[in-house]
Amino acid sequence: MSDSAEMQQPELLLKSMNKLNGYHPQLIIPKKTLFKCDLDDKQSRLQVSSMHMENSGFLTEDEKRTIEAQKMKKRRTAGLRVAFIDPESQQYVLELHKWTKSYAFVKGWNKVVDKNDKTFKVGDVFSLWVFRCGGVNPVHDGVNLSGGHADSVVDGLEQGSLCFVLVPAKVSVHDGNLPQDSGHDGHNDNLPQDSVEPSSFFDESYELNHLFFDQEDSQGYLPDEDEDFGFNDDGSIRDSGHYQ
């Protein structure tokens, strides 16, 4: 059994797994801090470090190929479609993209931010979990969900698809429940906390996705990786007009 499976699993994760017949839960990021750039509707993405995503080993070979194919094309092509559950148990379908030095949840992230605009704040800390979705449980909380449901994340997703759960850190990871190799500050030594401001995490400007409005995307923006941009002091991506 994995370290994350042995940990106390948060209630939000367990409820989500029950509703979606989930299996193989795994803690991906013990501490993910929201920065200004994560909540900016013009950047329209939740960015996470490659170290967490790749060291966790939860991606299948087919999923890796899908993500790598999207990265190599460096165009606004589809990434890996995944389910995503916010702290209020609201469900979405997002795309997971791989950039040069990070991964990002895009194509729908703006909707997550809009739905949580009263609760998401810069500096909030969450943990990010993932499990495999086996399909909607026909009966959940006394409600019959058979025959499809408007809120079903499996609509359009295959069984076995990834489902990510964003859990407020105060109810997810506690010092006494961390893996044995974790440090006293509440993070796994093998999976460093993803709470470093992007502007200080990277010392060089690096190829991030400049964002263009997609008229067919009601969620806002899709990335294009043809240009090289750096970070502002607040962690936001420098606009080309200000990049020297």
Swiss-Prot record:
<dbReference type="InterPro" id="IPR015300">
    <property type="entry name" value="DNA-bd_pseudobarrel_sf"/>
</dbReference>
<keyword id="KW-0539">Nucleus</keyword>
<feature type="region of interest" description="Disordered">
    <location>
        <begin position="175"/>
        <end position="196"/>
    </location>
</feature>
<keyword id="KW-0238">DNA-binding</keyword>
<feature type="compositionally biased region" description="Basic and acidic residues">
    <location>
        <begin position="235"/>
        <end position="244"/>
    </location>
</feature>
<feature type="region of interest" description="Disordered">
    <location>
        <begin position="217"/>
        <end position="244"/>
    </location>
</feature>
<protein>
    <recommendedName>
        <fullName>Putative B3 domain-containing protein At2g31460</fullName>
    </recommendedName>
</protein>
<dbReference type="GO" id="GO:0003677">
    <property type="term" value="F:DNA binding"/>
</dbReference>
<dbReference type="GO" id="GO:0005634">
    <property type="term" value="C:nucleus"/>
</dbReference>
<dbReference type="Pfam" id="PF03754">
    <property type="entry name" value="At2g31720-like"/>
</dbReference>
<keyword id="KW-0805">Transcription regulation</keyword>
<feature type="DNA-binding region" description="TF-B3">
    <location>
        <begin position="49"/>
        <end position="147"/>
    </location>
</feature>
<keyword id="KW-0804">Transcription</keyword>
<dbReference type="InterPro" id="IPR005508">
    <property type="entry name" value="At2g31720-like"/>
</dbReference>
